[in-house]
Design a protein with these regions (language model features):
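Active-site donor-binding acidic/aromatic loop of nucleotide-activated sugar
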Residues: 7-12, 25-33, 40
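An anion/phosphate-binding loop that grips the pyrophosphate of nucleotide cofactors and donors
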Residues: 44
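A short hydrophobic beta-strand element within the catalytic core of glycosyltransferases
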Residues: 47-49
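Nucleotide-sugar-dependent
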Residues: 52-58, 80-81
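Short hydrophobic beta-strand element within catalytic cores of glycosyltransferases
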Residues: 70-73
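A charged, aromatic-enriched C-terminal amphipathic alpha-helix characteristic of glycosyltransferases
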Residues: 108-137
Length: 137
């Protein structure tokens, strides 16, 4: 889900070819930009966050979990912190494709759902204010 930058068109074509060659078109959809992302998360069996560059905070994962989706992601950056706390079953060692496949199968067949989201704006704001208050006291 999401737009494709011009610099990533070849990569998208490669992914689409791979999906086609594995006969997975009925399982994997490339949607492009969408305004109804919450609805997409709600009907998704699994949401993947497999960015090679570690993100400081995985907002897409928080959004997906808030919609009740299971999430699988690399064990680095913000993804690691979020999944460790909310859905540790979805953590995969960076670039370990066999582990990714195994984890995906386990998550897909499991009834486990992510824990309640603790990364809310209200909670994080209160934590920041508490930190500042402790520093000035």
């Amino acid at each position: 889900v999401g737009p494709t930058a011009k610099s990533k068109k070849k990569y998208l074509n490669k992914l689409q070819y791979k999906v086609s060659s594995l006969n997975l078109e009925d399982k994997i959809t490339f949607t492009g930009s969408r305004r109804d992302i919450a609805n997409i998360y709600k009907i998704s069996d699994i949401v993947f966050n497999l960015s090679q560059t570690p993100e400081p905070f995985g907002r897409t994962m928080i959004e997906a979990i808030a919609c009740g989706a299971k999430v699988v992601g690399w064990n680095h950056g913000g993804a690691s912190e979020i999944l460790s706390e909310l859905f540790p079953q979805g953590l995969v060692t960076l670039n370990h494709m066999n582990e990714l496949l195994k984890t995906t199968n386990q998550v897909a067949s499991s009834n486990s759902l992510p824990r309640e989201n603790i990364f809310t704006a209200n909670r994080m704001t209160n934590s920041t204010i508490s930190l500042y208050q402790s520093l000035i006291s």
